[in-house]
């Protein structure tokens, strides 16, 4: 497959940031946007799912990286990098936690940075987002237009459920039935409480990213904790930059240290999640937290 999937010039070794939703990947992408060599693209899900939109979940493996699909993805990212006048791609899409094997097949030399955050913090933040409805109305039209423009017409119907649910949530002011990465089996959770759904979602997504990443060479995948990034931004970013084989950037470091969130927010869930909620989510979060090195 490697021979068939020859990569184009500026996407030879893209930097792909993976991390579950509400893990700090948007902020980290804004940090790397300060690097003069990088063209950063946030959440072009429709590029990664091109040709695979009828899948029942967001999981893609090397078997899904058919030559014409891989070629389209590389060409689309190549055009983006060139349009920005940069030399290298930096990309982040939360559902790519479930596509690491696919990414490695499309970009064999990709540098995959996995940003891991405590599942309780993710749960706390995602709960707020699920209630809020996310996008401002004026952004919905442009997002849907961009998505459909980048999708083959025969795959347009595959996007309808997500469009319908988003519009319904906005019009009725009711929470979305589901939001974020869709691991295998996600449909089976919908009859359960939103707390259980969010807990299972984080555990399944984080564990698959860790498992798939650990099967790659250490030169292709590296995992970093969000908590370390916040407490020691310079040290953690230096390690990321070295792993990605980027040149140093004072502008990047200055932006990170001036915009980093207060350390006090990292365990905010302790004050905001009551005992009942903690008891509900613990059976679903604790095994994954323990496996990933967190204490309950």
Named regions from a protein language model:
Residues 22-23, 45-47, 95-97, 118-122, ...:
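Short, solvent-exposed loop/turn segments at secondary-structure junctions
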Residues 92, 103-126, 240:
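Conserved phosphate-donor/acceptor-positioning beta-strand/loop module used by diverse small-molecule
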Residues 24-38, 103-107, 127, 223-248:
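PAPS/PAP-binding and catalytic site of the sulfotransferase fold
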Residues 40, 112, 221-223:
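Conserved beta-strand scaffold positions in the cores of enzyme catalytic domains, especially
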Residues 17-19, 89-92, 114, 223-226:
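Short beta-strand segments
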Residues 1-84, 129-156, 259:
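PAPS-dependent sulfotransferase catalytic core
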Residues 78-99:
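Glycine-rich phosphate-binding loop used to anchor ATP phosphates in small-molecule kinases
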Residues 1-16, 135-138, 150-296:
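PAPS-dependent sulfotransferases, especially Golgi type II membrane carbohydrate sulfotransferases
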């Amino acid at each position: 497959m490697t021979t068939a999937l020859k990569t184009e010039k500026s996407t030879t070794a893209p930097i792909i940031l993976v991390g579950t939703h509400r893990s700090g990947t948007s902020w980290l992408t804004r940090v790397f946007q300060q690097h003069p060599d990088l063209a950063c693209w946030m959440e072009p899900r429709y590029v990664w799912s091109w040709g695979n939109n009828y899948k029942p979940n967001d999981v893609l493996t090397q078997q899904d990286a058919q030559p014409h699909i891989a070629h389209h993805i590389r060409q689309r990212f190549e055009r983006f990098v060139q349009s920005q006048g940069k030399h290298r791609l930096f990309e982040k899409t939360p559902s790519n936690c479930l596509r690491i094997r696919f990414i490695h097949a499309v970009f064999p030399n990709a540098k995959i940075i996995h940003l891991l955050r405590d599942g309780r913090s993710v749960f706390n933040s995602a709960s707020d987002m699920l209630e809020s409805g996310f996008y401002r109305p004026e952004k919905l039209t442009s997002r849907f237009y961009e998505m459909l423009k980048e999708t083959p017409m025969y795959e347009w119907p595959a996007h309808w459920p997500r469009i319908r649910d988003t519009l319904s949530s906005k019009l009725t002011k009711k929470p979305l039935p589901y939001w974020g990465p869709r691991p295998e089996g996600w449909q089976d959770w919908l009859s359960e409480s939103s707390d259980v759904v969010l807990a299972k979602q984080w555990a399944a997504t984080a564990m698959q990213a860790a498992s798939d990443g650990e099967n790659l060479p250490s030169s292709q995948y590296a995992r970093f904790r969000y908590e370390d990034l916040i407490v020691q931004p310079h040290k953690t970013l230096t390690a990321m930059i070295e792993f990605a084989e980027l040149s140093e950037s004072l502008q990047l470091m200055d932006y990170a240290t001036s915009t980093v969130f207060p350390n006090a927010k990292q365990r905010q869930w302790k004050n905001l999640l009551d005992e009942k909620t903690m008891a509900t989510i613990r059976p679903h979060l604790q095994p994954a937290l323990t496996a990933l090195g967190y204490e309950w």
